[in-house]
Amino acid sequence: MAERRRRLGDWGEAVAVAYLAQHGYQVVAQKWRCAAGEIDIVAQRDGVLAFVEVRTRRGVDPGMAAGSITGAKRARLMMLACLFLAAHDLPADTPWRIDVVAIAVASQGRVAIDHILAAVEET
């Protein structure tokens, strides 16, 4: 079961990268890791860095995937974004946000993608 879930997640990340590229984003990093965790995708468009969390689920509603991000995950994503900026010596005033690309895969193989800009904000 874990292998199947990992393959679905990897497939979803590849779909998200293609989607972002089609919408004018330049992918800066994929699966960026540090001791605190992983950022699925870091992309840039119009001078703004987007730290992208990809959520892939089976079903017909991408909202189900987006809704699976807990408060703890939101806090971790904020921390990871700050760690990425520091690790790459980017200025503190670098514009950035955390997006979610939610992907739903229906049983018929139809794919729905929802790109939620600034889905995670500081609280």
UniProtKB/Swiss-Prot annotation:
GO terms for molecular function: nucleic acid binding. Signal peptide: none annotated. Pfam families: UPF0102. Gene3D superfamilies: 3.40.1350.10. It comes from the Bacteria. NCBIfam families: PRK12497.1-3, PRK12497.3-3, PRK14678.1. Belongs to the UPF0102 family. This is UPF0102 protein RoseRS_1723. It comes from Roseiflexus sp. (strain RS-1).
